[in-house]
Structure formats: structure tokens, C-alpha cells
Regions:
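Soluble ligand-binding/transfer domains with enclosed cavities or grooves
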Residues: 2-208
């Protein structure tokens, strides 16, 4: 592969990242440094890139875009937190009934990467009471260029292999006055509405 040779002599676009294979994304990811903790600040749009399996892709796209309640737009970060146990925190952006809403919060810190042990920017969802926290979702963020980050998403006990996505921005400042329409995810589980009507594997529901 020659992906790492391309980094210094070009500006990447989201479309170019989408055209890379899973193996090429992994090679590229391993070659990158972490984003600096204090510099990832504000709201970013996001695009899913690749999943390790076809089943993972189908389930992932249904979870993010097909539950009938929301459409995932991206993430937002602040390098500080009112909670002394967190170094930083953030939220996910969704479009619901034509409006942008914020939920699925996370805590952020620097930690050893699950991929190669390098120090990396990490998002942990388990400190908050939301679905992503219930499956112990952990994301990592690495710096590709000034407006673009390459990221992995993991969940469940096995964690690996990860999903790949990218973040581009920041496009807006962090919204410190978010209203948390489904609950603040601190004392009680967030009540995000969803439907299983479009679940991609309906035969599995019959066996429950």
C-alpha cells in the first residue's frame, strides 16, 4: 500500500477517504498523530467511512439514520467540563423533525489507543446514561489535516475491529446551553424515541 506516502503532498477530501478500502483506512489511521486535546473545540460534521463487515454496515446505518427518530449529523467538543472527573466532554448532533437536537453525551480525555498504543484523543460514553454508554462505546480521533480528522468507533466488550468515520470542522462553537430534549443523561437513561419498524434483520426480533 502507498497511502502513507500521500499524506504530506495532498489535501484529503471526505470523498477520497470514502473511496479508501478498510485496510487502507487502517494504514492511514496508524500513521497519524492524535489531535491536540485543547484544539478540538466546537461542532463538527461527520461522515461514516467504512465498517469491518457488511452486517456491521447495515446495522450501523440503521442505528444512525434509519430508526425513524433521528439522523446523525456529527459531534461537538469542549476541552473543559463542569464535572471534575472529566477532562472534557461533548455531545452528538442529530436532525429530528427538521431541527437539530443534541444528545448522546460523552466524556473526553487522552489515552492509549486500542489500535497501536499511541496516546490519542478518546471519547467515552459510559459516564453518561445513554444507549452508546450502555454498549461501552469508545471513539478515538486522529489529526489528518487542519479541517479533517480520521476517527474510529468501537463498542461492546470485544471493541475491535472498529468502524471508521471522519470529522470535518469546526463549523460552529460548542453549544454550552444545550437543552437535552431527551434528558441530561446524568441520573436517568435518555429517552430517545425510536422504532423497530425498519429494523434490517426482522427475523431476529421474532426469536427474542
Amino acid at each position: 500500500m502507498t497511502i502513507t506516502k500521500k499524506i504530506s503532498d495532498k489535501n484529503w477530501t471526505v470523498e477520497e477517504l470514502k473511496n479508501l478500502s478498510y485496510e487502507e483506512l487502517m494504514e492511514l489511521y496508524k500513521s497519524l498523530p492524535s489531535v491536540e486535546f485543547d484544539k478540538i473545540d466546537g461542532e463538527y460534521d461527520a461522515t461514516m467511512l467504512k465498517y469491518p463487515t457488511e452486517r456491521g454496515r447495515i446495522l450501523g446505518e440503521w442505528t444512525l439514520y434509519g430508526t425513524g427518530s433521528s439522523h446523525w449529523l456529527g459531534k461537538a467538543f469542549t476541552p473543559s467540563s463542569e464535572n471534575p472527573e472529566f477532562r472534557g466532554e461533548g455531545y452528538n448532533k442529530f436532525r429530528v423533525d427538521g431541527k437539530e437536537v443534541h444528545h448522546t453525551r460523552f466524556a473526553s480525555d487522552m489515552h492509549e489507543s486500542m489500535i497501536d498504543g499511541k496516546l490519542v484523543f478518546r471519547m467515552r460514553y459510559s459516564p453518561f446514561k445513554n444507549f452508546s454508554g450502555s454498549v461501552d462505546m469508545i471513539d478515538e480521533v486522529r489529526f489528518l489535516q487542519e479541517d479533517l480528522c480520521l476517527c474510529i468507533g468501537t463498542y461492546n466488550p470485544e471493541k475491535l475491529p472498529p468502524d471508521f468515520f471522519c470529522l470535518f470542522g469546526p463549523l460552529n462553537v460548542y453549544d454550552h446551553s444545550s437543552e437535552w430534549p431527551y434528558g441530561n443523561e446524568i441520573r436517568r437513561m435518555s429517552k430517545v424515541p425510536f422504532t423497530l419498524d425498519n429494523y434490517p434483520f426482522p427475523e431476529e426480533l421474532k426469536n427474542e
